């Protein structure tokens, strides 16, 4: 599953290291105002979308918007209908059944024989993270990550994240600046597997982290919930996803171990 890969909207989604976040300014650029900085920062959020939304996005002053939500970096989930490799790039047609298939271009490093240069075969369901682009009024994605789905629940999760993300961002953007709630920063799930929880809900946790935390909170036993019971209740998640969510919650002070390293209780427990 996708854990904290695009999991919230902050400076960068991948790995939390900011490696994919473009620098807002440039050499010789005038110092931007606070409003400009905030606007540009918002544009760096990785927003879960459908292809239909991307195709209907409007481009004004070099900024894409879906309604009042500014977008630049997005994620989509769909099936590859066609793949074509050229010397410097791979072009996919990806279909999520909300509109016509969309062109997704992934540039390849001709000096690198890594898996990033391997063509993902047609009829494979994938999650794509990339930048929305428009050329001659035709929209496409320039992908910086394409990952085959490991679990078809990720497709359903993505649709829920799309709804949640756009509701939250639309509400946030409609509020006065002074009263706008901060939007937290994303992370990455399993080694590059930008898990199905790209969006962080209001408490700053991913879907997977919230599921783990809520189960631990709900356990009435004094010693807390043990890992085996937790894993059995989260059969839709891989073991590594559960462990990563627990590691994050423990490091952030949401849960703590009790009688041994396999039993956990919430710090909010009575």
Swiss-Prot record:
InterPro entries: NA-bd_OB-fold, RFA2-like, Rfa2/RPA32, RPA_C, WH-like_DNA-bd_sf, WH_DNA-bd_sf. The modification Phosphothreonine is found at residue 21. It comes from the Eukaryota. Its main location: nucleus. GO terms for molecular function: damaged DNA binding; single-stranded DNA binding. Residues 187-270 are annotated as: Interaction with RAD52, TIPIN, UNG and XPA. Pfam families: RPA_C. GO terms for cellular component: chromosome, telomeric region; DNA replication factor A complex; nucleus; PML body; site of double-strand break. Keywords: Acetylation, DNA damage, DNA recombination, DNA repair, DNA replication, DNA-binding, Isopeptide bond, Nucleus, Phosphoprotein, Ubl conjugation. The modification Phosphoserine is found at residues 4, 8, 23, 29, 33. GO terms for biological process: base-excision repair; DNA replication; double-strand break repair via homologous recombination; mismatch repair; nucleotide-excision repair; protein localization to chromosome; regulation of DNA damage checkpoint; regulation of double-strand break repair via homologous recombination. It is found in: Nucleus; Nucleus, PML body. Residues 21-40 are annotated as: Disordered. Residues 74-148 bind DNA. Coiled coil: none annotated. Differentially phosphorylated throughout the cell cycle, becoming phosphorylated at the G1-S transition and dephosphorylated in late mitosis. Mainly phosphorylated at Ser-23 and Ser-29, by cyclin A-CDK2 and cyclin B-CDK1, respectively during DNA replication and mitosis. Dephosphorylation may require the serine/threonine-protein phosphatase 4. Phosphorylation at Ser-23 and Ser-29 is a prerequisite for further phosphorylation. Becomes hyperphosphorylated on additional residues including Ser-4, Ser-8, Thr-21 and Ser-33 in response to DNA damage. DNA damage-induced 'Lys-63'-linked polyubiquitination by PRPF19 mediates ATRIP recruitment to the RPA complex at sites of DNA damage and activation of ATR. Ubiquitinated by RFWD3 at stalled replication forks in response to DNA damage: ubiquitination by RFWD3 does not lead to degradation by the proteasome and promotes removal of the RPA complex from stalled replication forks, promoting homologous recombination. The modification N-acetylmethionine is found at residue 1. The keyword S-adenosyl-L-methionine does not apply. SUPFAM superfamilies: Nucleic acid-binding proteins, Winged helix' DNA-binding domain. There is a cross-link at residues 37-38 (Glycyl lysine isopeptide (Lys-Gly) (interchain with G-Cter in ubiquitin)). As part of the heterotrimeric replication protein A complex (RPA/RP-A), binds and stabilizes single-stranded DNA intermediates, that form during DNA replication or upon DNA stress. It prevents their reannealing and in parallel, recruits and activates different proteins and complexes involved in DNA metabolism. Thereby, it plays an essential role both in DNA replication and the cellular response to DNA damage. In the cellular response to DNA damage, the RPA complex controls DNA repair and DNA damage checkpoint activation. Belongs to the replication factor A protein 2 family. Component of the replication protein A complex (RPA/RP-A), a heterotrimeric complex composed of RPA1, RPA2 and RPA3. Interacts with PRPF19; the PRP19-CDC5L complex is recruited to the sites of DNA repair where it ubiquitinates the replication protein A complex (RPA). Interacts with SERTAD3. Interacts with TIPIN. Interacts with TIMELESS. Interacts with PPP4R2; the interaction is direct, DNA damage-dependent and mediates the recruitment of the PP4 catalytic subunit PPP4C. Interacts (hyperphosphorylated) with RAD51. This is Replication protein A 32 kDa subunit. It comes from Pongo abelii. The lineage of its organism: Eukaryota, Metazoa, Chordata, Craniata, Vertebrata. The gene is RPA2.
